[in-house]
Amino acid sequence: MKRALWVLAVLLSHWRRHKMQFATLLIGLIAATALWSGVQAINQQARNAYDRAAATFGGVRTAMLVAPNAATFPQELFIKLRRAGWPVSPVLEGRVQINGHSVRLLGIEPVTLPVDVGNAPRLGATDLSSFVAPPGQTLVARETLRGLQQAEGTAPAISSGARLPPLRVQPQLAPDVLVVDIGVAQRLLSKPDQVSRLLIGKPRGKPAPLASVVGEQLERVEPNAETELERLTDSFHLNLTAFGLLSFFVGLFIVNSAVGLAFEQRLPMLRTLRACGASARLVNTVLVVELVALALVAGLIGLACGYFIAAALLPDVAASLRGLYGAQIPGQLSLRPEWWLAGIGISVAGALVAAATSLIKAIRMPVLATGQPGAWQQRQRRWLILQSCAACGAFAVALLLLHYGQSLIAGFGVLAALMFGAALILPAFLDIILLVGQRFARGPLVLWFWADSRQQLSGLSLALMALLLALAVNVGVSTMVETFSRTFIGWLNGRLAADVYVSASDNAQGVAIRNWLKDRSDVQAILSGGRAEAQFQGQPVELLGLPDHALYRERWPLIETAPRAWTRLVPGNAAFISEQLSRRLNVQIGDVVEVPAPGGTWELDIVGIYADYGNPKGQLTVNVAALIRQFPQTPQTRIGLIVARENIPGLIAALQKQFGLDDRRIADQATVKAESIRIFNRTFAVTSALNAFTLGVAGIALLTSLLTLANSRLPQLAPLWAIGLTRPRLATIELTKTLSVALFTALLAVPLGLLVAWCLIAIVNVKAFGWRLPFHVFPLHLVELVAVALFASLLAALLPMVRLARMQPANLVKVFANER
């Protein structure tokens, strides 16, 4: 033990003499751990919220009985089932508005509520009495209370004017959910003696068969391990995880570079330790212990940084998930102990992986070879060939996944294999470019410039790989986002056909508004729409009703149509299908779909496929009159108006005055479009932030590589100084070499980035969301990214070059006295 401590003390003395290397190693581990753990913290927070929502009083984690058409059903069925021995409990669900904030209202019957329902509160006798006895209680999560700007104990009014029972905080509830006694819910939702579903508890005996009690009025839905929300958001979280992994590996490149150089510089020290009697096993064990200790320290710091990164990004992530999927995520972090343990574990594992090559080389290197300055460079050519072969293998894997893969994971696998192969083959490409430059060089200094750049390549290769990956991801993601932005704006122009949008509070007000508008000369057309929900092949589908108007024929974003598609839509036996639903269910033009409706099955011929970006649900578009015939309960509250631009403000003011409509119930096209674009931009704010983080880490990788190489470069630079080149000129040459190699890397990153963009658009987006975007290239944006890469490289190279320009001549003279 004493000998091991002495060996550890000797090894640690290296870091006292090379503080910059020590900082480099810690920075790499901290950056890798921080970005990875930050992304994982966000994902964990979101998944915790999904779990809370899924387990709240009969989410998908609970078996239940529902009506086949997903409508409410009479409370009498609950009584019949209880008498027949079924352990069921009724739930009524609806939506209410409080101060313009829409929330879910759940009515439960606490006495019969199954004990195994996920987030059901355990109400004691006193609590139960307070919950059901007048005035009752409204259970609410604390974040919902804050969102409603209410205090505990208040009884807020809903949009109909009725008041909720006093609010009481229930911590385990999901956000934006209010829970009341079912009798209260029936009154507030104007659904007397109606139930949305019946939760099924554990039976004590054998109940009567379901069909013998209720016939075909109800059907059983089994619990599901994964919620619809989780399935919808998997792609979003996988995207975040991919960014986190990329940043993690870029950070490990820094660690690998620092550890590799530290091992090379410590080889004489290792030789001395071996000569003094320390065994190879002891030395390598102590090296691992040292590395693990450093990884633990860096991991703790990285976790703290990851927490702050997650806290900074979480509001944008929550906004993205809310806008894209309707998912409610708390805006404050609450992390479990396993997150901290996983962060420490990933830091230690990453450090060991990054140092594995150096440890293996140190074990296999003969003792006497440790004194040779070029011992490691002798194997560089062999490693270059091996890397190129591995790159070809990675490209082959990418092609196989592209051809045979069908899942989202396969899509990301194509990206990972492609980028891994490109990173591995980069040194070989750069070596060829520098060799060509060397062959065409004229003059001794220029020849040395190219030859020395090739020699320096081995020390910079990992940092350049990190730069290549960061740039390629930046090019790919930014191209995808810009393409999406351009396509989205064009799509909005088609979908937002009307000039003014009105949402009546109920059907009666809708009729009154239409009658009033008919007498207005400034209204050119009244476009009434409607929406209904249905289950189609086990999936929730939104039915959108459109009026028969020329404006929709001109603007609706159809991708593919059958002949006379709009004409066939009018009678009500045809429909357009959204692109994502078409892909999900493999439905094409000419197919017939059967939609369950209250009056029976509704058969629809598919006559068109249209883009429906950002909608997590599948959608079928039908004629609005046919929709109301098939779904009589469809709210007829959605009204679009065609109005001359100069008449819009006056019409909106008149509607607000006549019917008391607030800004949430009436808006012009420009306002709706601006809000949609704002949500779109915020959705990709996280992506932009992670892009910047990744590029920043790549810049740090280049900086640390140059700093760690600075001392080992002196034997190559001292002879040039001795023959008359000044130190500032040497620094300029070194800077030019670094920028040249960075430029070559950036130029190689452009086609790789465009390939990444194509994979994101044609593979990942299609698998994740169901829609495919047109591919656009933005040359000015590519030039801008190359310039940013060069600027980052300039900043990274500046400090080492300034140190070289100001170096004391004595340090250069020492090179001739000692080759090391």
Which residues does each PLM region occupy?
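Membrane transport/envelope proteins' first extracytoplasmic loop
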Residues: 2-251, 261-264, 280, 320-321, ...
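Juxtamembrane segments of multi-pass membrane proteins
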Residues: 64-65, 69-70, 425-571, 576-579, ...
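Short cytosolic juxtamembrane segments of multi-pass membrane proteins
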Residues: 364-379, 802-820
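Short, solvent-exposed hinge/capping segments at secondary-structure junctions
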Residues: 139-154, 576-592
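Alpha-helical transmembrane segments
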Residues: 17, 21-22, 26, 33-59, ...
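Alpha-helical transmembrane segments, especially those used as permease/efflux helices
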Residues: 1-5, 9-24, 191, 209-211, ...
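Interfacial "coupling" helices/loops that link adjacent transmembrane helices in transporter permeases
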Residues: 18, 253-296, 688, 700-743
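Small-residue-rich transmembrane alpha-helices
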Residues: 256-259, 293-325, 338-364, 390-403, ...
